[in-house]
Amino acid sequence: DKDGMLRVIRKHRDAVSTIDATLVSEELLSAASAAWDEAVELSARFGVRNSQASVLAPTGTIGLMMDCDTTGVEPDLGLVKVKKLVGGGTMAIVNQTVPRALTTLGYTKKQVDDIIAYIDVEKSILGAPHLKKEHINVFACSMGDNSIHYLGHVRMMGAVQPFISGAISKTVNMPETATVED
């Protein structure tokens, strides 16, 4: 169904114009716009081989193997994760983007080092020295003592859905106290 697929590709392209330009770098927004313009042009000229232009697959373990802290729309499981190894034993995996995020937020090298040392010992950022209260949610993860509210997962899926022609496969973590109504 060539016409139907072209409508889908155009819909993805048109969704770029709905992105809040204050939340994304001009370079990234321009690249996204150009990529979808090219997708429309090439799809119209050559057709589309697959029935979907884009999907989001569950890639948590694969992401770890690729040395990524997180991939897709999945938040990090925790700032420090302990992975059971197939041959026995465990391996601690620390989120490598925390120092960069702290630096971007304006923390000094000494403050970053102190916060990272705290995370290494406590396995949490809550209570870390120098950490400003308004920055705590920046480091929220899918599980643990600073977890993202389940509606945050839903909102993230809603934000990317206009660019996904297939499915989003994602875990939405909810607390044990969640009810059917939740």
Model feature map: region roles:
Residues D1-A34, V40-D182:
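Catalytic alpha/beta core of large soluble enzyme barrels
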